[in-house]
Amino acid sequence: MGKKAKKKARAPTKEIQTMEISKKVSEEPPSQAGEIAEGDVKAVKETQACVHFDKALNLEKVLDKIKSSRQIKCAECNEGVYGKRGTKAKGSKGKKDFSSSDPKSNNKAIWLCLECGCYVCGGVGLPNGPQSHVLRHSRVTRHRLVIQWENPQLRWCFPCQLLLPVEKEDNGEKKDVLSEVVKLIKGRSLNNLASSDIEDQCSGSGSITSDIKLEGAVTSDIEARDGYVVRGLVNLGNTCFFNSIMQNLLSLDRLRDHFLKENGSGVGGPLASSLRKLFTETKPEAGLKSVINPRAFFGSFCSKAPQFRGYDQHDSHELLRCLLDSLSTEESALRKKRGVSDNDEKSTTLIESVFGGETSSIVSCMECGHSSKVYEPFLDLSLPVPFKKSPPKKPQPVSRAKKAKLPPKRVPKNVSKVSKVSKVLPGMVLSELNSSGKSMAVTADSDTSCSSLAPLDNGPVLETPSVLTLDNNQASESASQSDTGFDGSWLDFIGPETSGDETNLDMQEDGIDNVITAEVNQIVPSPNIVANSSVSSGDQTLEGNTERLMQDYEEIAKAEANLDEKDVQAMQSDECPATSGISAEFSQASCIGCDPGIGESSSSVNPWDEEELPLVVADSQILYMPYKEISCNDKSVEGECEASSSFVTGDHEPQNSDFVDFGGLFDEPETTEGPVFGPPSKAEASGVGFMAFSSESDPEEIDDSDLPVSVERCLGHFTKHEILSDDNAWNCENCSKNLKLQRLREKRKSNEDESRSSNTSNGWVKENEDEGFGETEILAVKQDPNDTSCVKDHSSDGRKAARIHSADESESKGTQDEDEDSEKVITVKRDATKKVLINKAPPVLTIHLKRFSQDLRGRLSKLNGHVAFKEVIDLRQYMDSRCSGEDPPVYRLAGLVEHSGTMRGGHYVAYVRGGQRVKETDSSSTAWYNVSDAYVRQVSLEKVLHSEAYILFYERIFSQE
């Protein structure tokens, strides 16, 4: 018993030894296996012929097994080809080496034995892995040939340790012996894919298996060997914008024909070479890996476009333009090195020959009918999309930052606060409405120290050029601030309106019973210079005297009527220049917001002298009274004049301790609303104002209220007539030329009129005007000096010569003027119509829908909504000239890019057409795939047409195909 037990214990050891031996045998050709694992796969056509294929193949048995089998699962571990749920079979005996629960089971594929039709799992690349069931099946059953279910292009022979060619020569013709097997595999793959997707959704596991990872799925038509395999691309770090564009470029037939032609003999630059490798990895016979790593190509591209380095999110349309431009520039540089001239017919680059089209812009003048046509090349059409304007938001009250109140200034008790009124502009008069609604006037009388307050009726106000008039709100503001002192800035007059009651209460608190009148002893010509004035204040009340004010008003009117203009001119000549300049500037400001009658009276001359009468002020008026005549030769006055001018311009800071600078009062930073585009910062996470730098407006929706928005509608809007007017008016060359000729004619005519008028002034032009050349010829014949009759003729000849010389001078002068006029550029702006049409249709039409926009504030927004598009589109109605001999511009959809999310963060996915080359308009023979980075799944055409497309790729249908 013990010996038997020992023999049984040795059996697994032998099995392990055989496995190790098989492992060594499988690793004997490291060059081939290593190259395949790295993705640098040689073409299957270059492999050697297998001597076991004809002997071992049992085609009938394999076909019967495929037709009779219900599920495609591994016979050892019961792992499905699509589900991969990781369930163990009863006969697996719980071995960990072959269990599907192994994390490496996701890298397995189903292989079909070509001798018995058994399904076994193995490696995705090659079936000779050390822990694959297909290797164990071959070792146990001695079966040598297998084919991969997910990619029938892979046929493997275990004794030869190499891939089998797809086609085999038979009587000089290349045929695929396994074509029937491949057709059955393809039919079963599509059916199982649909049923597996339905089961996963019903069982609730759709979160994992709804995005079926078709690693190396067969998407090419084997009969048409120019198809390709849709394979995922590794996300290198927020590179979905790059992967979505590359999936569409890899699906274009024209690019594939160029890069795969003659095995890539025409090697280009580094960017084109790395792109050729990507196309090679998508060949059907090279589908040995599930996912392609585009790191080499992306690094080569970033060397030419460094703005895409890093891990930031970018726009896929921007990347497409930069990529095409880089490829075209690289090819042009190589052609220059090779000495290819630009005039050669083949000088167009690959990108221009595939994506290049041409538009014609026709502009017609609405005045003369002249039209101009300009041709512009394009690589893609950017079409604007109509959108719904967001409803206007309710106006929110603008919360302006309140002025920081300064601490009260300490003033000696014996000095009344009223004395600070002396810092106000000399002779300033404030008017305000009292509680009874009548106007309360403050008058400044230079003859008396007492102030008077009286209600006034509204009446005309006499103004002078040196009087500044402000509105009622400004007057009340200045009156309310008179108790705290004038801060030296006219900006204080701009502020909220203060009622008369509040002002009176504030003034009573300061010990002022009524508005105060300042007596000016010495007046300086500057609004902010403190004058030598005294203000009478105290407990005495100011009594109003309406009759006295009316009498003063009548005296003022009489004084104005009796003024003489000479006195006015003399008085103006004695004024200081700086003062007059400031007065003129202030008088212009006084016209703003004042009554028409007041504005007219402001143009009158200042009639006031030293003994001026009190001035009557109407409502809503603030007047700066005129100043005394002071000679500008005084140094102190000169300094004050300089201070006055600098105060107006804001270039001088007074040294007065009571001065408060409000120059930056309105320099508040503009705050923006809305979310921010870009990665959030720490300030944003904590709620700090990150919004102030960049923001994102609310997402907008496509306007489909009138008609459903479609690509055809966007093309119609792109090619419709546009009226150019106002600032966008067109510079019509024909109108400019006509105007130029008209001006030359007028100039020539005026020169002729001037020459005639000058000759007429000599008195003899009319007499000899008709004789002209005849008299000159006669004078030329009479050349005998002895003849006395010739004297008069010679004198007349001199006059004739002078006349001819002057005429020549005028003619040369006119010609010179014409030359000068011809050199002048005359531009005439005319209203015109503009229409853009497609003049040359490209082989691959790229349509970019403008879903991203930026407003005037710099806020970014995305336009959400579906834009309808068709699988087949006809551009004949958008062409400039109708197609006669060439193929009509009919296109078929090849792929698209979709963006989901917002401006802050989103994701790009690609929808591409897989399978055979498009030869017919029938879409039933092709399959569509949704590719999201490394994940690939098959979708229906209806789902593709309902996606929110951002970039569309259309391939032109040619009759010769």
UniProtKB/Swiss-Prot annotation:
- Keywords in alphabetical order: Hydrolase, Metal-binding, Protease, Thiol protease, Ubl conjugation pathway, Zinc, Zinc-finger
The source's domain of life comes to: Eukaryota
Any idea which positions bind Zn(2+) 2? Answer: C74, C77, C121, H133
Top-level class of the enzyme under EC nomenclature:
hydrolase
Compositionally biased, Basic residues: which spans?
1-11, 400-412
| Basic and acidic residues bias: start-end ranges | 790-816
Q: What is its EC number?
A: 3.4.19.12
- What GO cellular component is one of the record's annotations? proteasome complex
Enzymatic reactions:
Thiol-dependent hydrolysis of ester, thioester, amide, peptide and isopeptide bonds formed by the C-terminal Gly of ubiquitin (a 76-residue protein attached to proteins as an intracellular targeting signal)
Q: Which residues bind Zn(2+) 3?
A: C113, C116, H137, H143
Question: Region Disordered: what ranges?
Answer: 1-36, 85-105, 387-418, 744-770, 784-826
| Span of domain USP | 231-957
Tell me what happens on changing C240 to A/S: Confers CAN sensitivity
Positions bound to Zn(2+) 1: C50, H52, C157, C160
User: Can you tell me which residues form the catalytic site?
Assistant: C240 (nucleophile), H907 (proton acceptor)
Record-level GO BP terms: protein deubiquitination; ubiquitin-dependent protein catabolic process
UniProt GO MF annotations: cysteine-type deubiquitinase activity; zinc ion binding
The Swiss-Prot or TrEMBL record describes its family as follows:
Belongs to the peptidase C19 family.
User: Which PANTHER family did the record assign?
Assistant: UBIQUITIN CARBOXYL-TERMINAL HYDROLASE, UBIQUITIN CARBOXYL-TERMINAL HYDROLASE 2
**General function of this protein:** Recognizes and hydrolyzes the peptide bond at the C-terminal Gly of ubiquitin. Involved in the processing of poly-ubiquitin precursors as well as that of ubiquitinated proteins. Is involved in resistance to the arginine analog canavanine (CAN).
- Which named protein is this? Ubiquitin carboxyl-terminal hydrolase 2
Q: Which organism is it from?
A: Arabidopsis thaliana
